[in-house]
Amino acid sequence: MSFLDSLFGKRQRSSDIARDRLLTVLVHDRVKLTPDMMEQLKAELSTVIARYVPSVDAGAIEVTLMRGEAVDHLKADIPLRRTSQKL
């Protein structure tokens, strides 16, 4: 690994990117979640979580499906806005 690779990271090959995209499509197909259903899931997650955690950044929620070795995973990345209050 050269110094520049360690500094900037190694770029993914287009074949790796295409493989990841294909796996994502296959997982979505297997789980039967359409893009509209994913958007609805995001909206409902933000509504429910905002009831308990008011600092949820609803516009930045990301929901992804990932293929695991034994099971598929639904991952929700829910960022919170920082508040000026100290704990």
Swiss-Prot record:
Disulfide bonds: none annotated. NCBIfam families: minE (TIGR01215). This is Cell division topological specificity factor. It comes from the Bacteria. InterPro entries: MinE, MinE_sf. Gene3D superfamilies: Cell division topological specificity factor MinE. Pfam families: MinE. Keywords: Cell cycle, Cell division. Prevents the cell division inhibition by proteins MinC and MinD at internal division sites while permitting inhibition at polar sites. This ensures cell division at the proper site by restricting the formation of a division septum at the midpoint of the long axis of the cell. One of its GO terms (biological process) is regulation of division septum assembly. Belongs to the MinE family. SUPFAM superfamilies: Cell division protein MinE topological specificity domain.
